Design a protein with these regions (language model features):
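ATP-dependent phospho-/nucleotidyl transfer catalytic cores
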Residues: 2-49
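Short, exposed beta-strand "edge-strand" segments with a Pro/Gly-rich flavor and a Y/T-containing core
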Residues: 14-20, 59, 144-150
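Active-site acidic catalytic loop and adjacent metal/ATP-binding pocket
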Residues: 44-82
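C-terminal catalytic region of ATP-dependent kinase domains
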Residues: 68-173
Length: 173
């Protein structure tokens, strides 16, 4: 069940047009009586947010994260719909080389975009903006949980062992 379909709020009838903010998500989860473990759900949501930042997922909106429903109760579902990560539309290797050799272009892809679908002050926010602001306690806690678990050597080995992509793609990822 997508997040958009679980709400018990006054915005539920307008959910297709509604753009959630970080505070909205926390409030909606806290108010929902059908969620079995609210604190765990909020923690897992922000774990997902940190991983989305790491993989550059620009499409995590209310219809592509959700819940499993049993006996009219909800538990957060395993993460799904990660197809919009690692710059999937960037296939031109000359452009990849340009980005890799240009610090300003690299910095844009670290600090400015991709952006999260979740709104901050009425606009999409960069992951860097949210994480570095330390504004959301739940996000800070997720960063503390997730960061030590990221082993860059394992990730580099995984990428290096993908036979179907070029060396340029491997370097870019």
């Amino acid at each position: 069940v997508p997040f958009n379909d679980v709400g018990e709020s006054t915005i539920e009838s307008n959910k297709e047009k509604y753009h959630y903010s970080y505070s909205d998500i926390i409030d909606l989860l806290n108010k929902n009586k059908k969620i079995t473990n609210i604190d765990e759900t909020i923690s897992i949501f922000f774990d997902m947010f940190i991983i989305d930042a790491f993989i550059g997922n620009f499409d995590r909106h209310g219809a592509n994260w959700g819940f499993l429903k049993r006996n009219n109760k909800y538990i957060i579902a395993p993460v799904f719909d990660n197809g919009s990560c690692l710059f999937p539309n960037l296939t031109n290797e000359d452009e990849m080389i340009f980005i890799l050799n240009n610090q300003d272009e690299l910095n844009k892809r670290i600090f400015k975009f991709p952006t999260s679908q979740i709104k901050l002050n009425g606009r999409k926010s960069s992951y860097f903006e949210i994480i570095s602001s330390l504004r959301y306690k739940e996000c800070n806690e997720a960063l503390t949980r997730i960061f030590p678990r990221i082993n860059m050597n394992d990730i580099f080995n995984l990428i290096d062992n993908i036979e179907l992509i070029s060396q340029i793609h491997k370097q870019f990822y």
